[in-house]
Amino acid sequence: MPLAAAVAASAVVPPRPPPPPPRRARPLRSFTGLILTRDLAALTVARCAPSPPAPAAEAEAEAVAVDEAPPAKPRPRRYPRQYPGEAVGVAEEMRFVAMRLRNPKRTTLKMDDTGAEEEVGDGVSEDASASEEEEEEEDDDDVVEEEEEGAGLEGEWMPSMEGFVKYLVDSKLVFDTVERIVAESTDVAYVYFRKSGLERSARITKDLEWFGGQGIAVPEPSTAGSTYATYLTELAESNAPAFLSHYYNIYFAHTTGGVAIGNKISKKILEGRELEFYKWDSDVELLLKDTREKLNELSKHWSRKDRNLCLKEAAKCFQHLGRIVRLIIL
């Protein structure tokens, strides 16, 4: 009986289920990181999102405004003005200065190589010509007398033996100074012009000895010659291009206007005697051409400022030479 009761009781009570597995809790930091990551992603997406397209009407208005705007004009390119004779060399530029001094009232000249007309005043820069304008006007007559073919000697000049000897004395001082500087200077620029064949100092000495043998007194150099010689000496030490401008123009003036003056003086007061001052051992035109070519080649290495200074000094050279020539009639 008791056994039967126990069996019945066991059949009525169900068995207990097994306990559930234990739950594992995730750390709080993982949950926080997940939230932060989601927030940053949302911010990034919001910041990089493309802006909404503009309305079609606004886009068309902008396109029409762009089409109606005038095109920008290109800025004009400025080229420096070329001086008359600049393509040939500084000696050619100085020739235009001489022509301007010889013909102060003329406004245009014809270029020999191109046939194009150029203003004579263009041969000197504004800086070079402005400071010399008044002096050039005062000494135009002097420059004309010395520069070309002795124009105006007939009927205007009354040369004297005493005045001509003074002219030779001052000329000798100028040529002595120039030739001494070129021969003794250590400046490389002057070396090219040594023994050019144009030298005049020794020949003038022979002429002055002849005048002394004729009983004619040979005076000391005048103020005009001494002033110019001093100026040349100082200039040679400070600026080679400026000095070479005087060097070339002194010989240029003598081989052109100087020879013409000598011929007329010889006929008037020397009974046709030809002086040594006007003689050369070879063709003087070739000698002057060789000197001119050397100067042009050397001037290729000069700045425009140096060339303008040469043009300014060329005008001064003709002024000084004009004062010396006037000694003939004083």
UniProtKB/Swiss-Prot annotation:
It comes from Oryza sativa subsp. japonica. Probable inactive heme oxygenase that may play a role in the regulation of phytochrome assembly and photomorphogenesis. Residues 1-13, 56-69 have a biased composition (Low complexity). It is found in: Plastid, Chloroplast. Pfam families: Heme_oxygenase. GO terms for cellular component: chloroplast. Residues 1-47 form a transit peptide. Keywords: Chloroplast, Photosynthesis, Plastid, Transit peptide. The keyword Transit peptide applies. Residues 114-151 have a biased composition (Acidic residues). It comes from the Eukaryota. GO terms for molecular function: heme oxygenase (decyclizing) activity. Belongs to the heme oxygenase family. Gene3D superfamilies: Heme oxygenase-like. The keyword Chloroplast applies. GO terms for biological process: heme oxidation; photosynthesis; phytochromobilin biosynthetic process. This is Probable inactive heme oxygenase 2, chloroplastic. InterPro entries: Haem_Oase, Haem_Oase-like, Haem_Oase-like_multi-hlx, Haem_Oase_decyc_pln. Residues 1-27, 50-82, 107-156 are annotated as: Disordered. The gene is HO2.
